[in-house]
Swiss-Prot record:
One of its GO terms (cellular component) is membrane. It catalyses: a (3R)-hydroxyacyl-[ACP] = a (2E)-enoyl-[ACP] + H2O. It is found in: Cytoplasm. Its main location: cytoplasm. The keyword Cytoplasm applies. Its EC number is 4.2.1.59. SUPFAM superfamilies: Thioesterase/thiol ester dehydrase-isomerase. Belongs to the thioester dehydratase family. FabZ subfamily. The active site is at 48. It comes from Natranaerobius thermophilus (strain ATCC BAA-1301 / DSM 18059 / JW/NM-WN-LF). This is 3-hydroxyacyl-[acyl-carrier-protein] dehydratase FabZ. Keywords: Cytoplasm, Lipid A biosynthesis, Lipid biosynthesis, Lipid metabolism, Lyase. Involved in unsaturated fatty acids biosynthesis. Catalyzes the dehydration of short chain beta-hydroxyacyl-ACPs and long chain saturated and unsaturated beta-hydroxyacyl-ACPs.
Length: 142
């Protein structure tokens, strides 16, 4: 398990865009499982939507991308590089995410070749699938 400080050593994201509170599982270069506690105090909930706060789907995708970046950046050969989000395909949202939900974010890297990586991401609330999609990452020099 990795706490928030260890996550910050892997990826450069910080408040308010850091979407991973801890990593429960990490297999460098293969897969990672992270957790995000969705608080009623999240800045994005002020406007999405004031009378019915929901976590935007794009931020669920961002959470998957950050967990995938942790799996990619945990490889020693990627030290000194930055994993950037290259794209997303076949995204589906299955369930709304609201304050109080605890997200379990799973990403499996399906292909890493050179500076490009691909992965499958899923976001769960409990046992319910909330979102899923295919992710593309690119490694660049810092």
């Amino acid at each position: 398990m990795k706490d928030i400080n260890e996550i910050k050593e892997l990826i450069p994201h910080r408040y308010p865009i850091l979407m991973v509170d801890r990593l429960e599982e990490l297999e460098p270069g293969h897969r990672a499982k992270g957790v995000k506690n969705v608080s009623a105090n999240e800045p994005f909930l002020q406007g999405h939507f004031p009378d019915r706060p929901l976590m935007p789907g794009v931020l669920q995708i961002e959470a998957m991308a950050q967990v995938g970046a942790c799996a990619l950046m945990s490889l020693p050969e990627n030290e000194g590089k930055l994993a950037v989000f290259g794209g997303v395909d076949k995204v589906k949202f299955k369930r709304q995410v609201q304050p109080g939900d605890v997200l379990s974010i799973e990403v499996e890297l399906t292909r890493v070749k050179g500076s490009i990586g691909k992965g499958e991401g899923k976001v769960y609330v409990g046992d319910e699938l909330a979102a899923q999609g295919q992710l593309t990452f690119a490694l660049v020099e810092k």
